Amino acid sequence: KACREHFVVTLVFPILQERKRHETEYLLEMLDNWCGQHQEKLEIVVNDWGTAALAAERKNFMVCLGILLNKRKKDPRMKYKQGNDALFRKNSLNAEFYRTYLKENFGIDRYEWESFGFPQIFPSGENSLHFPFYQTNTSQHCTLYAECVNGNRGAQDQVTDCPRYCERQAFLYPKQLQMMGRYNSLFALAPALFRNPAEMGRAYAAHGVKRFVLN
């Protein structure tokens, strides 16, 4: 349907669990075959190295580095820090040799970023910026489930039958931090793009952002 209506589709893959490996391989193979039959390229966003390796084996994908692999320090309390903050503006993707490694080994030359209320220096390439929410950290297993069942968010285990606690409950934090905990993540709000969208959009675009993703 998207192809008929001339929409470009991007598929975002979660962290690959071992029990989901064969299912993921089958899905990637099916998508690759479809792309070959229709002479299309499909953008795949990967969030772990296992999925990146599987996607790199196929020739009809444009592989993009997801936000869970594009690691950097993100915390609403950073604005209270004093001293030199220059190193917060860069991460590993600003190193050319690392981008070369990603391109040669996984075919990755597209990168997903998050707006988190702090200046960033973007590298060359296809950069996408997610806004206005960002993840400060993400656990492999659900911290909310661990708190509700075990009384300790650190006592995490793999959930096979989700009771959907997150529909009714969340971790709350002081209002000035503009953050909350839900699912296996902590989410925070960076409202700068909403306050002056035209000006902020032009500023980000001038510094290497090619696409904005409303989340």
Describe the residue ranges of each PLM region.
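Active-site pocket-lining/capping segments in soluble small-molecule metabolic enzymes
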Residues: 1, 7-215
